[in-house]
Amino acid sequence: MSEQITFATSDFASNPEPRCPCILLLDVSGSMNGRPINELNAGLVTFRDELLADPLALKRVELGIVTFGPVHVEQPFTSAANFFPPILFAQGDTPMGAAITKALDMVEERKREYRANGISYYRPWIFLITDGAPTDEWQAAANKVFRGEEDKRFAFFSIGVQGADMKTLAQISVRQPLPLQGLQFRELFSWLSSSLRSVSRSTPGTEVVLEAPKGWTSV
C-alpha cells in the first residue's frame, strides 16, 4: 500500500526554506460593517501585493487568517505565494477570547508540522485587529498569550480600530496595543509586510530591529 503524501509534506519537500508564520486575527463583527470592512479588505490586497514583490518572502512567509464574528478559519497556513486575500463581510458579535485560543492552537500545530519535517522557523507572529470589546470570556486566552510570550513561543501584537476597548487589549497583549489612525489599513499592512520581509531575511533565532510604526498609528 503506497504511503499518502500530504500537501504540507509535499510543500516542505519542494521548499525547505525556514518559515516565518503569521496569523491575522481579524474582527469582522457587525460594527465593522461599511467602510471599515472595505478598507480592511483593501489592506489585505496591499499586504499580498507587497509580499509578492519579495522573492525570498514568498518562500519563507506563511499566512493564516482567523476571523471572529463568529470564529472562523478563513485561511489555513499557506505560503505568501499561494495567499489570495479573502473578501471579508461584517457580521455577528466579538468572540475574541475563542478566536485568540484558536489562533494559538493553529500556531502550535504548525510548529509541530515544521519540526516533523525538519523545517526551521522564526518565532510566529499573531496580529490581532479589533474595533470593539470581547463578548466572550477572554481571561483564559490572555493568560495563554502571556505564558506564550514569556516562553518566546510567539509574538502577539494588537491593533485597536476606532471604538476598540484599549484597556482590555492592554490586559491581553504583553506589547502595548496600538491605535489605528482613522482607517489606515493599507498603511498598516504595508508596515506589516515590510516587517515580515525583514524577519524573513534574517537567521531564525536572531533578534530583528523592526521599522518603527509610522503613517498609521500614534505611539
Curated annotation (Swiss-Prot):
All residue ranges annotated as the VWFA domain in the record: 21-199
Secretion signal, residue range per the UniProt entry: none
PROSITE patterns: VWFA
Superkingdom, taxonomy of origin: Bacteria
Pfam families: VWA
Protein name in the entry: Uncharacterized protein YegL
